[in-house]
Amino acid sequence: MIDRSLIGKTYPPFYSDVTEEKIRLFAKATGQTNPIHFLIESAKKEGYPSLLAPLTFLTTVSYEQEDPYKYLKDLNIELGQFLHANQKYTYFSPVCAGDRIKMESKLSDLFDKRGGRLQFLVFRSTYTNQDKVIVAKSKSTLVVR
């Protein structure tokens, strides 16, 4: 069982530079076809300063850390014990190439199902750009067996 006293635990902020290459690779990998993710001219024509990141692009930010699964170790969860159950983003401003994103996360909730056989961890993250503008918030739910 995961210690409920860990609810509210925060993690050190992490910074990620959004580049044209990262956007193009992610857009290609996720089957995007809109040219605003590939061609600067198309993005600018639509009013963006540079390539626009696809909506789920921010998922990749946490995986750029030196140890992206450190939070699992902190909670004594082995990699094979959990599944990603849900992810929800709320966007406030576009994320574009040239942005520097700061990600701040915390464990916001922990609850059980099936008599405690399954534990659900809810992480909330805030993504802020170089201008200190909150561009998005996310809620990620993991299930641990």
What residue spans do the PLM features occupy?
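Hot-dog-fold acyl-thioester-processing enzymes
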Residues: 1-84
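A beta-strand/beta-hairpin structural motif
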Residues: 84-90
